């Protein structure tokens, strides 16, 4: 439940306003939904951040990465990255080849709103999210005239970040152009605990050993992103929109800590050119709304590996996706009923080659969903959703979701929520057709999920606001797809696992005015997520039964705190991931377990207001305590490093 809003925000003006009571009704579209919202203030902290960085410090979900500009994946509630659906302005951007999304390729400055849909709540947005879904969108900032925002960032390891936004609004038109450019040698130093150097005496006897200090080799990157938005609002209130996003990326793949060769002997890099475009139309009236969207995705991926000028891998992939959707909703206000529906089509065309092998495949993916939400009284709501999907020529079983919520006490705004759902995920095109190893006989992964939660929100208007929530969840997933070695010398996917994931997620936020010009905001989240293989052994030597899944921490947590005084702002960010096993048997011999780690970042910003422009100066320290850690086996992470950002927003209308 939310507080009755008054137009002035105490976090900005610090004015004394009398207390108010909480009486507003929860939006009907949110009935039974377990979600985490990340606002633009967090998304636009600094231009060097990707969505992987944002999610690490602002949620309890697991972000797996091996440093900046490297593959970064996200997983909910003990599931895998392919069980997370990602939607950008209505367009699903999961790779049809791999089934997952690289969040390091999504600059946070290109996103205005991000919502995490946990568990069953993802079904309303997309099928296949056995763990959850991430919903990303851009929003118009309607202002007449020209606008400009430029930020220059300089950081350690020869890192340079640039952001430029040009806006123009006149009448019913609004245009926005954003450009993000990042480049770095990324050659930080680290202590290599996977190697030992001997110490010799004068007689060449070994008298000791030490772990050498090395540089991150072959790790440079250069990324360019251009996002164009165009909006038009008709006299009747309808809206037309265009969103076009182009990416050009060159990334070297760093050498592992176990590589003994010199960097000039290797060429190991990947290139990506991609375009994502969506056009939309929204017809909005008092009680009903209808919308239509069409989109297109083109992606060209290139991966090259050579050693001593001998090319051993030259992989090329082209992906074309055509997208269309129609949606609508109707509200019976007097009866407290909201009906909605959506039909979406994705047609994927993939051509992948590596020398003389590869595959050429296409698949249509049709999805339809209907939902009904009923709120007969202010303190109670019920929702039911049914989704049906077609993958190629195969229909899935119906995907139902039932959710209920109710306010059990207005004192403290205590609300209980529960839901149950069935879900599934179809094999990716690589699972089916990759050569060598693809398995066209794979079955879809299916599962049942249950969760229940409690939340409370209290506060004193213009003094403080506190919100806490906790959720319990449980999922059973069958026919989990796993790539296994074969006697033919390559890996092939099989439906082998039955996985039981369960646990608790908790969140808390506090906003408080300490004094007239002092403000404090705290946000925290934590998750305990055992995810265990409970299937039958696939061989006599299978020791994975009853063990935690690899690269799934049982515990994770994050905290952000912002202290503001007039034009000064201090931001502290902390995140923690528990130990992760690298083997399905949880064997800790050699490097079978990655130790837990704690990450601490801090930022200090000062804003300046002149008649002709607003300026900002920000300094950031990452890995404040210079912790030595790894997130992925044999991939070193950077120690303490520094960044400086300078931003400017000219005031065209006020300039004389």
Regions found by a protein language model. Give the residues of each.
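Membrane-embedded beta-barrel scaffold of Gram-negative outer-membrane proteins
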Residues: 287-303, 409, 417, 444-502, ...
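Short, acidic, small-residue-rich periplasmic hinge/interaction motif at the N-terminus
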Residues: 6-44, 81
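Flexible loop and strand-edge segments within Gram-negative outer membrane beta-barrel domains
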Residues: 184, 188, 217-225, 231-290, ...
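Short acidic/polar hinge/loop motifs at secondary-structure boundaries
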Residues: 91-119, 436
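N-terminal periplasmic accessory domains that precede
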Residues: 19, 51-54, 72-75, 101-107, ...
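Extracytoplasmic beta-strand/coil segments of soluble accessory domains associated
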Residues: 52-95
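Structural signature of Gram-negative outer-membrane beta-barrels, strongest in the C-terminal barrel
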Residues: 338-340, 344-346, 350-475, 560-562
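Gram-negative outer-membrane beta-barrel transporters
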Residues: 375-379, 471-476, 495-582, 614, ...
